[in-house]
Amino acid sequence: MKHRVVGRRLDRTTEHRTAMFKNMVTSLFRHERIVTTTPKAKELKRFADKVITQAKRGTPHARRLAHRDVRDVEVLNKLFDTLAERFKARPGGYTRIVRVGRRAGDNAEMSVIELVDRAPAAAPEAEEKGEKKATKAPKAEKAPKAEKAPKAEKKPAKKAAKAE
């Protein structure tokens, strides 16, 4: 019976699983969007929401607790300075899971897990692409094709053998 059993093992030892989630939550806070398998994304959502809730407290003790899970100081500062302010008014549900299909190699169901109020990073990329298209030179006309050389006549192999 599975009463009061919470979480997934994901076919890993406890140490491997906790290390994996610490690395994944650090990547999630750094990039604000990562692609992973759906079961990992569902577990990471629980893990990340707890860390963001700690960051919203903003106390030195909360920073120490979050530092256990987010070992990169740069990402930890981003979490407490930027992300905590962004999610201040939100009572929970800081992440979103979007299924994106199946992985080609092993047919595993893949998902994108992202922070709900992501920074608008897509707009500058679109502007850059537009600028590149605008500055692109028009294509030059194609040169006319050269005339083909006449092919040499070949005798079939059987006739050539009989002729000798």
Swiss-Prot record:
UniProt-annotated stretches for the region Disordered: 118-164
Regions of compositional bias (Basic and acidic residues) in chain numbering: 126-164
Entry keyword Glycoprotein: no
A GO biological-process term: translation
Molecular function as annotated in GO: structural constituent of ribosome
UniProt entry keywords in alphabetical sequence: Ribonucleoprotein, Ribosomal protein
Top-rank taxon: Bacteria
Cellular component GO terms held in the UniProt record: cytosolic large ribosomal subunit
InterPro entries associated with the record: Ribosomal_bL17, Ribosomal_bL17_CS, Ribosomal_bL17_sf
PANTHER family per UniProt: LARGE RIBOSOMAL SUBUNIT PROTEIN BL17M (PTHR14413:SF16), RIBOSOMAL PROTEIN L17 (PTHR14413)
Entry's family note: Belongs to the bacterial ribosomal protein bL17 family.
Oligomer and partners: Part of the 50S ribosomal subunit. Contacts protein L32.
HAMAP family documented for this protein: Ribosomal_bL17
Protein name: Large ribosomal subunit protein bL17
